[in-house]
UniProtKB/Swiss-Prot annotation:
Residues 1-36 are annotated as: Disordered. This is Small ribosomal subunit protein uS5. Belongs to the universal ribosomal protein uS5 family. Keywords: Ribonucleoprotein, Ribosomal protein, RNA-binding, rRNA-binding. It comes from the Bacteria. Gene3D superfamilies: 3.30.160.20, 3.30.230.10. Part of the 30S ribosomal subunit. Contacts proteins S4 and S8. Residues 1-18 have a biased composition (Basic and acidic residues).
Length: 203
């Protein structure tokens, strides 16, 4: 009996060896795993810019349900190196209105000319609507003779010595536009010489 049991066990073991082992398919974890999305830090172009809130006022909009109260903010930004911009934002909350105004100002950046001493090249007169702004060069050490929205524009643009005079309407938005229009009228000595077909020494 013992011999028969041994033979059966030997036969069974031989059958097991002859049978091909069933192996589970190898799963490549690297292939199945989806690549992680890369996170990029968006660099803001206005990191070196300064903001100045010129005016905040409360506005209302009449709807079927009644009056909807909101706030509007007028902001001027600049890098004090010849780049300046302005924008307006509206929202239910004042901070949100200021953020929208800054975002709008980023899309309205302009480059203005200035001398090495921080003044303008010559007299200019800017106008927008009924607002008029006169800008005059000033000697070094004079400072900024301006007030209100005009001062915000010339300071953030980087001017250090300048005379200004605002006349006509005093709406902040129109005054800012008039100031920028005046600054854009500047001509450098090289540009004036080119227009007159003369050299710098002949001017």
């Amino acid at each position: 009996m013992e011999n028969n049991v041994k033979k059966e066990t030997i036969v069974d073991s031989e059958k097991v060896e002859k049978q091909q082992p069933v192996t589970a398919p190898v799963v490549n974890k690297k292939e199945n795993t989806q690549p992680k999305a890369k996170t990029f830090k968006r660099e803001t172009t206005t990191s070196n810019f300064e903001e100045r809130v010129v005016k905040i006022k409360r506005i209302s909009k009449t709807t079927k349900g009644g009056r909807m109260m909101r706030f509007s903010a007028l902001v001027v930004i600049g890098d004090k190196n010849g780049t300046v911009g302005f924008g307006m934002g509206k929202s239910i909350e004042v901070p949100d209105a200021i953020k929208k105004a800054i975002k709008n100002a980023n899309n309205n950046l302009i480059k203005v000319k200035q001398t090495k001493k921080g003044s303008i090249y010559h007299d200019v007169n800017g106008r927008h609507g009924a607002a008029k702004v006169m800008l005059l060069p000033a000697p070094e050490g004079t400072g900024i003779i301006a007030g209100g929205p005009v001062r915000a524009v010339v300071e953030l643009a980087g001017f250090t010595d300048i005379y200004t005079k605002s006349r006509g309407a005093n709406a902040p938005m129109n005054v800012i536009r008039a100031t920028i229009n005046g600054l854009l009228q500047q001509l450098t000595p090289q540009e004036i010489a080119r227009l007159r077909d003369k050299s710098l020494k002949e001017l």
